[in-house]
Amino acid sequence: MANNKSSKKRVEIAERNRLQNKAYKSSMRTLMKRCFSACEAYNATPGDEAKTSVQASMNAAFSKIDKAVKRGVLHRNAGAHQKARLSVAVKKAIDPAPASAS
């Protein structure tokens, strides 16, 4: 347990930051899940409206990930990893690979 005033304050600040980071990560994960579900919806029923939904959800998730990296909630490489996951899912949904001729 903290013994002096400054260490008690650091404990309080660390707890506050932990809760803020937790909330930020949670909202980031939610936006990522929305993007993945939008990709699945586009695969089920392709159309212009579904495509714009995929693009909008991807942009929102990218923005949130970039802000998390900027705030220090997420490491730069972890942010890049999550953005790559989203990009692959969106690319696979919008531009599916053509079937091989073999």
UniProtKB/Swiss-Prot annotation:
It holds the Pfam family Ribosomal_S20p. Keywords: Ribonucleoprotein, Ribosomal protein, RNA-binding, rRNA-binding. The keyword Protein biosynthesis does not apply. InterPro entries: Ribosomal_bS20, Ribosomal_bS20_sf. One of its GO terms (molecular function) is small ribosomal subunit rRNA binding. One of its GO terms (cellular component) is small ribosomal subunit. The keyword Nuclease does not apply. GO terms for biological process: translation. Gene3D superfamilies: Ribosomal protein S20 (1.20.58.110). Belongs to the bacterial ribosomal protein bS20 family. Binds directly to 16S ribosomal RNA. This is Small ribosomal subunit protein bS20. The gene is rpsT.
